[in-house]
Amino acid sequence: MEHHQIYRHKKFDMGRKIEKCDLQLKEELISRSGTPCTSRSPFDAANQSVSLGFSDQDADFPPLPKRRRLGSSSSSVSYQSASPIITEAIQDIFKYHVNMVRKFPKKERSPKDQERRNKNTIACRMSRRKKKFDDLQIEQQYKECSDEHLKIAEQSLRARVYLNHLKQLVKQEDHPLVSSRRVPEENTKSNFSIDYLIGGIKQEHA
């Protein structure tokens, strides 16, 4: 009996590989913590969530190449490396909030259901904290880009003012030549003022 090989696209295998890695990591996390409500320091939680959130993606998908920017001598802003996020903001993300405590009475569950519930709880915490971390990173990138945009706008405005000043200087250099040419023409014109006419009449009578 011949066995026909079924064609499978590599993206399906890759998706299964990621899911298996996620399940293994969650099982290890559950086995180490024991219960999802055990007390941990904010630094340990931050390290675990960040490493679990980005380890699978970094292993399967290589990082994208950085976009090249047109560097100039006047611009002092450069994105060679992403600036680190403030530790106070990270601690605020992983801070324990009282309003997140479950208020309804506990229900008796089988060990399998309780284990599944613990996995779901840990997965929700990881996804929620990872989302907050991503939002914080995007907000910081927005601030850096807005600062760079303001610096570029200020430089362009200064260059425009400098160009207008140069144009005015060029016009002033051409203007004295025209005025010097017009001065003799104005002197050659006869003066028809009242004082001049009165003086001329007095000279004729004298």
From Swiss-Prot:
Species classification: Eukaryota, Metazoa, Ecdysozoa, Arthropoda, Hexapoda
Traits of the deletion mutant: Embryonic lethality with increased frequency of embryonic head defects and reduced embryonic cell death.
Record function comment: Plays a role in inducing apoptosis and is involved in the repair of head patterning defects in the embryo caused by extra maternal copies of the homeotic gene bicoid.
Region (Disordered) location: 54-77
Entry protein name: Protein Mabiki
GO function term, MF aspect, one: DNA-binding transcription factor activity, RNA polymerase II-specific
Domain of life, per lineage: Eukaryota
Cross-referenced Gene3D superfamilies: 1.20.5.170
UniProt organism field: Drosophila melanogaster (Fruit fly)
Keywords: Apoptosis
GO biological process: one example: regulation of transcription by RNA polymerase II
